[in-house]
């Protein structure tokens, strides 16, 4: 939602929680193909003047995206092409350390895709043939809750799913 002050109210798709995203950099992807940056912050973000700063529950109702643009009204934000329904994505902060350790937000889905692509690369590099037609099927539907079975090719009788496992 584009708020009267030009900032954005967001709602989550999936498991991201506002308290995990506070002060994180975001990108706003418009339907017109433009990308803008901003930061998710508490609506009254100044610890110096907000006496309830530490007590305020962080939810998507108490936080907002402050755009890295000179906008102070809904009209100015909309003039950039930003509208309700555009996608706001958190910076995953992906890093590969000197020792090869990979750290990132949202790594579960990336790792699952990496496993499938690694398997496909192994088959190609080793010139291996599987005994039946095999598809690597990747969906992006997990976060919206309706699964990916609708795009599985006809005739598929077996499936192996690779996903993260909460412990």
Tell where the protein language model's regions lie, with residue ranges.
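N-terminal hydrophobic/helix-forming segments and targeting peptides
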Residues: 1-167
């Amino acid at each position: 939602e584009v708020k009267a002050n030009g900032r954005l109210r967001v709602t989550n798709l999936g498991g991201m929680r506002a308290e995990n995203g506070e002060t994180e950099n975001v990108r706003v992807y418009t339907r017109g193909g433009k990308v803008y940056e901003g930061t998710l912050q508490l609506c009254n973000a100044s610890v110096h003047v907000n006496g309830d700063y530490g007590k305020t529950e962080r939810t998507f109702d108490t936080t907002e995206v402050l755009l890295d643009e000179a906008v102070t009204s809904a009209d100015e934000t909309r003039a950039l092409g930003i509208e309700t329904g555009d996608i706001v994505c958190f910076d995953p902060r992906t890093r590969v350390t000197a020792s090869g350790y990979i750290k990132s937000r949202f790594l579960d889905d990336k790792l699952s895709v990496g496993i499938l692509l690694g398997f496909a690369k192994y088959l190609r590099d080793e010139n291996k043939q599987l005994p039946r037609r095999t598809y690597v099927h990747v969906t992006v539907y997990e976060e919206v809750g309706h699964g990916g079975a609708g795009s599985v090719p006809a005739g598929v009788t077996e499936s192996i799913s690779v996903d993260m496992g909460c412990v």
